[in-house]
């Protein structure tokens, strides 16, 4: 664990620019195995995203890399990634869904869904890795497509304005509901 060793001697800031490589392989029991406590998770998807801003603070580009086993239908996978990124952009930049005691206090038309004319250049990167036998080698590419988006955007704005934010939608951006 090279990262663990380096963290003993350096701060995170001191490790900026260094790269660390690793692999995670989940051991599971075969479907239908006669095991007392079977590990039944078939597969995990992994993802990372990058947000680049223009000088005025608008999003210039989103790059999204998703590891998904075998892309059975690559065009459909790209569409799923793009849709999830745009959904995540709405969460991060424009959508507000107030609740009061668990009950919605907004109507659909007032949520502030992200508008198509504001969508920046999107780069979908499909990372295929063989090895899983189930489902022709495919791993799910559903909700994971929207999960890294808001943190990537928040990180870009932190570099842009120095303001660390932990609530969505982010404040101090050029985007309005």
Where are these regions (language model features)?
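C-terminal catalytic domains of large/alpha subunits in multi-subunit enzymes
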Residues: 1-177
